[in-house]
Structure formats: structure tokens, C-alpha cells
């Protein structure tokens, strides 16, 4: 079997104008970035007669290598089109942090990929750079404001706006700026986040138009005065300049799968330290122009799916017609106590124990009253006994578990799943909310921790309690909450795998993201700037004298 990059390099792509035509878009509706990439001009008109079905692809708590959720997503989109259901996929764009870190490329794999793969995984159309520039320009303007007149009395000790980079770089988590004398600015402690975890990224992904983007940027709270009053970008007068830097980045990107299914890729927030969903605009365009839209959310359903349903769905104005939960035998064995170096070996006892993790995710999606199917992503090490164990356990839960081989067979290996998705999407179910925005911040945190994670209670640090008091006084208590949590466990401790219950869930810090429209709650030891592993994926990457890339998965 060739590598992902070898398969992608051999692909015969259609001109992007032909892909656009499948969505009813003319050459005037797109801005081409070469022959195979384009940005979609806004606004996009709705195509009459479309079914507008939305399929959400999520997963279980993964191994560090990921479980192929994007691969299944692409295979499902291709399979639906092969079966005659006009489909578009809507995905997040990769961050170079994970690309060069643990997971490598993030455009699917095998024969279920989005192309041009190397472009998408590296710089693509420049959205990540635009977001980084907008974020850091605002940071520079804030520091300059403090150094100059500082009319509002912005306290350097209480600035919460950080600089960002699109890399995993732990040494930048805590830094001191402004050293070197009076002309170098006001010295203060600060730090860097990764671009994918920034509020600027969340704002881009939740904005419904350029006008809405500008309003959201203006609402950003950058810090507090000496009197502890919040200061926004609007108050500083920087809203227009920052919006200007994102005038092209707000336009979703159009590419294609190996099977020429339209793929709209836009925005890339992580689901563990951000809200984990691609842009509202990308999903809206797919829904307006397609019978079926297949989209994804990051990591397991405890993170990405919860945030899609509680944060993105209200802005999008659409509820998923069906949910696909991607599971693998190897991740279930890991959650059942198997050694991480022995996951390719058959281990039915560990698999049976690990099924508690999948069961929790299924039950969580059932709490929202959504139709569910489990996709068992096939790996070569899987045995018939393992697949049967998963399917039998799912049957006891009342859900189908369908084996897919999107990696080796593309859409052809995903057609059984596609047929079940079409069937489920026709069911008429009433969506159940997990909480109401009018609930208190404490109650919203408790709803997620107890109903989704299985916790006994939420334990707030003294700092978090003070912050909630401040947020209540400011009238910010009606915002949804976005919990930053490890992707490996339902708890705030990444070593506690499976499906723990009756544990304390700790919140140490809260950050108001008024531009994005939610409050971030940091649990456990979660960092908003990741670090690199001992052997990052970058070690295996190379390019030869002819520009041929190797090692990009």
C-alpha cells in the first residue's frame, strides 16, 4: 500500500472551477488560488430543491495517533455521492502544530483524502497566517497603547490577550516582554497560545458575515483597568484595523477529495483547548448547496460534539440529522487497559472493558436525542472476533455498528455506512438541549461535567470562584461555556481512561471570550500552547531537489 503522500501525488484532480459548478457556483463566485484551490466569495445563495441534511462525525476518546475520523468523514462523503446523494464535506483546516508534532497531516488518509494534501497541511490559502497576524497586531497595539498615554488606565498586570504562533512551542508558554529600557515598552509577564486555540480563530469560525466578524472583534476583552473594569477592542479603537487583516480569511476554502467530492475547509480550532468545529460559514455554504453535508468536530464526542451542539449549533441554526461515532478496536483496547505498545494484538477482555467508553459516548449523544450509528474504522490488525465483539455490544445499546475501510477502499469501503446514514437522517427527532444559556455559569459547568463526563461534581479553584463573581457582575453569565479538557479521558486527568464515574472535576481558571461568545473554563493542567513530543513527526519529513515531499503521512 503506498503512503498517503504518494496516493495524493498520483491523484488526478479536477479544475476547481468544475468542483465549484457542483455547488452551483460560477467562476465569478470564487477566487482561485492556482488550479485546484479557491476561496468562496460571500454571500452564497441557497440552491433550491436541496435536502439540506447535516451529518456530524465524531468519535471516542482516542489514542495519541488519532482514530481516522477525518478519513471516515471523507470516505462517507465520497460514498454518499457514489450512491447518488449530492454531498459536500465541511472540515477544519490543519494547524502546523500537530502536522509537525504527533499526528502528522490532517486531510484524511489512504484513498479517503482531501487534495492537494501537501498544500492544505502546510500554508494552504494563508488563513492561519492571517489569524496569527491579526492576533499579534492587536497584541502590539495593546503594548503600544500602554506605553503611550494609556488613557483608559489599562493595567499591564491584568492584560489577558496573548500573542500566538501556529507551532507547538512550549518555551513560549510564559515570557516577559518589554525588557531593555524605557523605549522598549512596559515590562510585563505574558505568554503565547497556539493560533488554533485563540479567540481570533473562534471568532472567525463563529462569524456569519464580515459585518458580524467586525462586531465580534470589537467585543474582545483584552484586559482590565487598574479599577478592574474590562477593556474591549472597540474602546481602544482598533476594531477596523484588525478586521481588515481578516477580510480574505473569512472566505471559506474550496478543494476536493480524491473522488472529486467538493470539500469546504475553513477554520481549525482544537476541540480540547478550543471549541473544535470548522466555520459556521463553511457549513452554511455546504448546507445551502447540497443535499447532504458531512462535517466533523475534534477528538471525542465529550469534546467536539458537545461543543458543536452547545456552542456552534445555536449560531448555525441547524441541528445534525444524524451522528456518526467513529470507533477503533485499538482505542477501545487502550481504554480497556491494554498496553499502548500491544494494541495490534487481539485482546478481547480489554476490548470488552473498553466498550464502556464507547457506551458513554453513545449515551451522551442520546441525551441530545440524536440518531446515532457507530463506524468501526478498520485497521489491518483488527480480527473478526474483535469486530464482532464491538458490533454485539452496540446491538445491546440499540445502535448499529458498521465496519468501514475508507483508508484502503475510499468511498467503496464506506457505502454500508452511507446507506445507514441516509436512513437515519430521515428520522424526525426533537433536539434536547443539555443546558440553557440562562443557567448560571456553575450550573452549565456542572451539566457538562456530570451529564457528559460522568463526574460527581465540579470543584472550582478560589481563582475561578472570584472570576465567576466578576463575570456575573459584568453580565457575562448568559454565555455558553467551553471547557478545555484532555482528549484522552472523560476526567481532567489524562491517565484515567475508560469511563470513570463519581470523580471530582477541577476548574482552575476561566477566560471571557466575548468576541467568540463563550467563556473558556480551563480544567486540570490543560495548556493552550502544546509542546512537541520526543520524536515529532517532523523528524520523518523531507523534500528532494525536485520538490517531491516525503513523510507528510
Curated annotation (Swiss-Prot):
Gene3D superfamilies: Domain 2, N(10)-formyltetrahydrofolate synthetase, Formyltetrahydrofolate synthetase, domain 3, P-loop containing nucleotide triphosphate hydrolases. GO terms for molecular function: ATP binding; formate-tetrahydrofolate ligase activity. Its EC number is 6.3.4.3. ATP binds at residues 63-70. The gene is fhs2. Pathway: One-carbon metabolism; tetrahydrofolate interconversion. It catalyses: (6S)-5,6,7,8-tetrahydrofolate + formate + ATP = (6R)-10-formyltetrahydrofolate + ADP + phosphate. One of its GO terms (biological process) is tetrahydrofolate interconversion. The keyword Nucleotide-binding applies. It comes from the Bacteria. Belongs to the formate--tetrahydrofolate ligase family. The lineage of its organism: Bacteria, Bacillati, Bacillota, Bacilli, Lactobacillales. Keywords: ATP-binding, Ligase, Nucleotide-binding, One-carbon metabolism. This is Formate--tetrahydrofolate ligase 2. InterPro entries: Formate_THF_ligase, Formate_THF_ligase_CS, P-loop_NTPase.
Amino acid at each position: 500500500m503506498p503512503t498517503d503522500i504518494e496516493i495524493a501525488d498520483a491523484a488526478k484532480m479536477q479544475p476547481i472551477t468544475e468542483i465549484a459548478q457542483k455547488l452551483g457556483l460560477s467562476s465569478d463566485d470564487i477566487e482561485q488560488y492556482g488550479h485546484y484551490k479557491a476561496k468562496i466569495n460571500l454571500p452564497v445563495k441557497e440552491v433550491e430543491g436541496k435536502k439540506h441534511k447535516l451529518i456530524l462525525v465524531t468519535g471516542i476518546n482516542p489514542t495519541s495517533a488519532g482514530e481516522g475520523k477525518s478519513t471516515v468523514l471523507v470516505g462517507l462523503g465520497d460514498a454518499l455521492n457514489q450512491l447518488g446523494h449530492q454531498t459536500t464535506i465541511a472540515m477544519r483546516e490543519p494547524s502546523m502544530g500537530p502536522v509537525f508534532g504527533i499526528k502528522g497531516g490532517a486531510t484524511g488518509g489512504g484513498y479517503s483524502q482531501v487534495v492537494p494534501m501537501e498544500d492544505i497541511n502546510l500554508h494552504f490559502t494563508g488563513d492561519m497566517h492571517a489569524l496569527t497576524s491579526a492576533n499579534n497586531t492587536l497584541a502590539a497595539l495593546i503594548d503600544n497603547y500602554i506605553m503611550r498615554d494609556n488613557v483608559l488606565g489599562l493595567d499591564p498586570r491584568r492584560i489577558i490577550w496573548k500573542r500566538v504562533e501556529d507551532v507547538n512551542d512550549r518555551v513560549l508558554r510564559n515570557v516577559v516582554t518589554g525588557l531593555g529600557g524605557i523605549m522598549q515598552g512596559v515590562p510585563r509577564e505574558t505568554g503565547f497560545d497556539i493560533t488554533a486555540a485563540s479567540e481570533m480563530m473562534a471568532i472567525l469560525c463563529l462569524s456569519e458575515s464580515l459585518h458580524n466578524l467586525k462586531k465580534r472583534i470589537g467585543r474582545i476583552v483584552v484586559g482590565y483597568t487598574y479599577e478592574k473594569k474590562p477593556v474591549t477592542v472597540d474602546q481602544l479603537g482598533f476594531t477596523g484595523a484588525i478586521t481588515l487583516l481578516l477580510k480574505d480569511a473569512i472566505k471559506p476554502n474550496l478543494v476536493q477529495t480524491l473522488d472529486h467530492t467538493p470539500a469546504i475547509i475553513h477554520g481549525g480550532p482544537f476541540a480540547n483547548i478550543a471549541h473544535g468545529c470548522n466555520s459556521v460559514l463553511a457549513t452554511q455554504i455546504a448546507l445551502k448547496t447540497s443535499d447532504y453535508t458531512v462535517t466533523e468536530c475534534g477528538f471525542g464526542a465529550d469534546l467536539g460534539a458537545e461543543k458543536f451542539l452547545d456552542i456552534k449549533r445555536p449560531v448555525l441554526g441547524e441541528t445534525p440529522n444524524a451522528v456518526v461515532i467513529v470507533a477503533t478496536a485499538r482505542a477501545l483496547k487502550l481504554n480497556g487497559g491494554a498496553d499502548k505498545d500491544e494494541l495490534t494484538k487481539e485482546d478481547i477482555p480489554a476490548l470488552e472493558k473498553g466498550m464502556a467508553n464507547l457506551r458513554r459516548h453513545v449515551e451522551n449523544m442520546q441525551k441530545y436525542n440524536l440518531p446515532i450509528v457507530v463506524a468501526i474504522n478498520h485497521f489491518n490488525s483488527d480480527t473478526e472476533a474483535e469486530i464482532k465483539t464491538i458490533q454485539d455490544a452496540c446491538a445491546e445499546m440499540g445502535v448499529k455498528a458498521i465496519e468501514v475501510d475508507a483508508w484502503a477502499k475510499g468511498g467503496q469501503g464506506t457505502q454500508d455506512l452511507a446507506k445507514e446514514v441516509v436512513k437515519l437522517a430521515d428520522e424526525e427527532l426533537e433536539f434536547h438541549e443539555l443546558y440553557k444559556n440562562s443557567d448560571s455559569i456553575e450550573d452549565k459547568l456542572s451539566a457538562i461535567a456530570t451529564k457528559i463526563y460522568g463526574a460527581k461534581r465540579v470543584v472550582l479553584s478560589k481563582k475561578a470562584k472570584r472570576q465567576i463573581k466578576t463575570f456575573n457582575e459584568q453580565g457575562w453569565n448568559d454565555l455558553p461555556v467551553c471547557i478545555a479538557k484532555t482528549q484522552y479521558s472523560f476526567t481532567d486527568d489524562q491517565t484515567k481512561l475508560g469511563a470513570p464515574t463519581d470523580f471530582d472535576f477541577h476548574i482552575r481558571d476561566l477566560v471571557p471570550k466575548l468576541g467568540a461568545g463563550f467563556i473558556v473554563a480551563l480544567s486540570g493542567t490543560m495548556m493552550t500552547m502544546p509542546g512537541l513530543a520526543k520524536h515529532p513527526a517532523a523528524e520523518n519529513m523531507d523534500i528532494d531537489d525536485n520538490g517531491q515531499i516525503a513523510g507528510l503521512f
